[in-house]
């Protein structure tokens, strides 16, 4: 999809950009694959704020996505490519020959009418899903499982991709988008190709109200809060932090402190750390 620019008819539209949605073929989702999505506003079941900057936004329905891609040996055809308000990537509706319908993440280059397949015998073709052990070295992949049968958990955002680097016994070495090289069990599945809608990151929101439509609330600096709300708060006028270094709202060191748990069980599968 191309980036659409606007004339500066107002200050809010001066630098605003948007996707032109040329790839989208329908604006109505498949009703059987949607369900109610109630807003939480970043609160937990006690009503306490656990995730900041969430709240409001346009009403949405959740689209049920097939991340497992476990319909082996049954051919499916791409019926539509649709917008999904719950993720940065677009989604594709697949009509299988046995009558079932499923949504998948729309890979780059997929078109209406294309045929896709899942399983160890599937061709190495964009949109097909196979176990990692059946995918040749150097192939670009996305929607990667961490545990066999659990469904894809990694490389699902718009424009994201990973690459098969090699094999090591029952494991496959995959280079992720972050630069990290990691071992995955060969029986874990992945989908061929990269995720579509790669221009998503180039969109300029343009104005605060558009962020509110997306359900994003403002981010307030700690230095303009009261001392009760943030370690940087208080003082007369623009006061310095008054600490040896910047802190999070909960009093823990910020900016540069490593937060990954030491001796994490998955450390043994990471061959090369991600780029800084």
UniProtKB/Swiss-Prot annotation:
It comes from Exiguobacterium sp. (strain ATCC BAA-1283 / AT1b). Residues 28-57, 219-276 are annotated as: Disordered. Pfam families: Ribosomal_L2, Ribosomal_L2_C. SMART domains: Ribosomal_L2 (SM01383), Ribosomal_L2_C (SM01382). Part of the 50S ribosomal subunit. Forms a bridge to the 30S subunit in the 70S ribosome. PROSITE patterns: RIBOSOMAL_L2. Keywords: Ribonucleoprotein, Ribosomal protein, RNA-binding, rRNA-binding. SUPFAM superfamilies: Nucleic acid-binding proteins, Translation proteins SH3-like domain. This is Large ribosomal subunit protein uL2. The keyword ATP-binding does not apply. One of its GO terms (biological process) is cytoplasmic translation. Belongs to the universal ribosomal protein uL2 family. Residues 28-38 have a biased composition (Basic and acidic residues). Disulfide bonds: none annotated. InterPro entries: NA-bd_OB-fold, Rib_uL2_dom2, Ribosomal_uL2, Ribosomal_uL2_bac/org-type, Ribosomal_uL2_C, Ribosomal_uL2_CS, Ribosomal_uL2_dom3, Ribosomal_uL2_RNA-bd_dom. One of the primary rRNA binding proteins. Required for association of the 30S and 50S subunits to form the 70S ribosome, for tRNA binding and peptide bond formation. It has been suggested to have peptidyltransferase activity; this is somewhat controversial. Makes several contacts with the 16S rRNA in the 70S ribosome. One of its GO terms (molecular function) is transferase activity. HAMAP family: Ribosomal_uL2_B. One of its GO terms (cellular component) is large ribosomal subunit.
């Amino acid at each position: 999809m191309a980036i659409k620019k606007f004339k500066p008819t107002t200050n809010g539209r001066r630098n605003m950009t948007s996707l032109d949605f040329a790839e989208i073929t329908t604006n109505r989702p498949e009703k059987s694959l949607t369900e109610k999505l109630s807003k939480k506003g970043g609160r937990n079941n006690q009503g306490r704020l656990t995730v900041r900057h969430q709240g409001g936004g346009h009403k949405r329905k959740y689209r049920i996505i097939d991340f497992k891609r476990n319909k082996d040996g049954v051919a499916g055809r791409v019926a539509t490519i649709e917008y999904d308000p719950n993720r940065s990537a677009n989604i594709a509706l697949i009509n299988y020959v046995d009558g079932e319908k499923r949504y998948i993440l729309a890979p780059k280059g997929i078109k209406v009418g294309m045929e896709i397949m899942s399983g160890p015998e599937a061709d190495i073709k964009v949109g097909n899903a196979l176990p990692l052990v059946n995918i040749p070295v150097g192939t670009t992949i996305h929607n990667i499982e961490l545990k066999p049968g659990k469904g894809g958990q990694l490389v699902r955002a718009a424009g994201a991709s990973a690459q098969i680097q090699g094999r090591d016994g029952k494991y496959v070495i995959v280079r992720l988008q972050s630069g990290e090289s990691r071992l995955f069990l060969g029986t874990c599945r992945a989908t061929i190709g990269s995720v579509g809608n790669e221009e998503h990151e180039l969109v300029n929101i343009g104005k605060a109200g558009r962020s509110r439509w997306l359900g994003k609330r403002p981010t307030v600096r700690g230095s303009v809060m009261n001392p009760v709300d943030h370690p940087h708060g208080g003082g007369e006028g623009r006061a310095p932090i008054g600490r040896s270094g910047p802190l999070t709202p909960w009093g823990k060191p910020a900016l540069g402190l490593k937060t990954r748990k030491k001796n994490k069980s998955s450390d043994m599968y990471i061959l090369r750390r991600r780029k800084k």
